[in-house]
Structure formats: structure tokens, C-alpha cells
């Protein structure tokens, strides 16, 4: 293919350079796009050392400024290494992407290919507060080329001028086949009333694009003499941080109130539309975000949930405000995700 853009990083000593044709790699649930790139090597500066490239999936949980006190805030989940120079063994046939990159870097180019395991998490981060410095908590992927005597010798100190790296993203789209949406219902009796208020809420499908309107269908049967004054719809993001501890918490990403009066012994059937947007939640610390906005984790049957690093799901709550002041109702559904690729 003709390359519209090449991502390139050169080491400080200019002995090696890393080339990629893209930085977003799609997780199709059953498989993941291969990571195919090229390393340009100038052997004159190697001094008998070798050139390696690695792809690492890491979980970070802290700020960079804390590293100065000797604490490690990065945990490698998965690492693969390939010796680039001198060339050893046989290599797979070049991909069209690698052929295009080799034309950019000439005779000193050496292709590499990584296959990302399907059970690894997607790139996601927890949004820091505006005043926070350094990296937030999250999962990222790094491609790094380096010059060393051995691939991974803890006693060998590798100088920064002998390395070059690029951060890439593993992203996930919704499956093309989308299931029917969830439905929840509840009834509640109030004091001084022998009949209940019935609430039913549903959505048409279980997955939505970020930025898409979400129609919430609401049915109310008020058998009491009390008046339903207001309907409140809330969308919550639930995040599970699985790697360093069992940590689960929720953030509200949308709250909207609708002034609908349902008098005693009457009914209402109506659709209310809500649109949760990341742009309305920029100040919220700890909100899970990714390249498209709000992320959602899609798990293949049999996949180890503990490998996902950060699990993200959503629920919608529908509450009725009744004249007595009591709150009624509840709808829980996993529904927001990237849309399918077209």
C-alpha cells in the first residue's frame, strides 16, 4: 500500500530507527491485527552488540514523578522479543506494509512481525484530574528497539541513546451482530396505599456507538392515588481494576430529569433519549477513556477476565420521583461500546 503517514523514532545515537505504518491495531475478538514494522540498523555503531525489538503490554498505576523514589508503577502483562540484527533463522514473508516501509529505509531495513494474544486487554486509561501530573492508571502497548549484548539480561544496563520506542494502541470494536437490549421492571407500594406503582424500562439493543442517541423506553402504571412528578435517567460507567487489586467503582456519565406528571390511577408509555458524551465529563477523575471516548470491554467466551487489566461496563438507571418523595425504579444494562467497523 502507499503510506499516507509513517511513524518513525530514531535512537539518540542514530544507530537504529523504528518504523511503523500505523499505531492503532484492531482486536476483532477472535484475532488481532498483526504488528508489522521495520527497524533500520547502522552496524557501524553496534560494537559487537545485537539489535532487538520487543512488544510489551503493560499496566501502569501511578505517576511518573513517583519513580524518582525507586517505586515501580509499571507491570508488564505480556512481552515478546525478536532479534533483529544479526539476522537469525528464517523470517515470515514481508507484508505489504513492510514492503512499503522498506522502500523508505533502504538496504539497512529489517522487518519484524508480532502477533498479539487475543486474551490481552485493550488500550484504556483512567482519566486523571486536571491538576494531576504524569501518567494516569491504564493499559498501554509499547514497541521498543534497543541495542544490547543479550535480549533480557537484568545485569546489563541499556543506555537511553541505544533505544527508540513508539506507543501503539490495541482497540476494540463492537461485533457486527448486536443482541437485543435488556429490560427491567419493578413495582413498589407506598405508605397509605394498598396498590403499587409499576415501572418497566428497556432499550432496543445492547451496544451503542459513543455519541449515539440512546432511546430508553419507559412504561409506568400508577395504580395509587399519588402523583409521579419526575423521571430521572442516569448512565453509570463501572470500572473494575483487576491486576494489582480487586477494585470496582462507578462514575456517573449522564444524569437527565424529565418533568412528566403521571396522576393517580393513570399510565404513561414514552421513549426518552439520552446521549452520554465524554466532552461533558472531562473533569471527572478516574473515568475510563480510550481513543473513541467511553470504552467498553467485550469478552470472548472462555477468556480469562483477570487478564483484561481494566474491565469497563455500563448501566442505565431509571428513577421515578413520587409525590411522597420516595424513589422508585432501576434498570441495569451493559450497552455502550465502539460501533462495528464499516
Task: Report each predicted region and the residues it spans.
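C-terminal beta-sandwich interaction modules and adjacent acidic
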Residues: 1-342
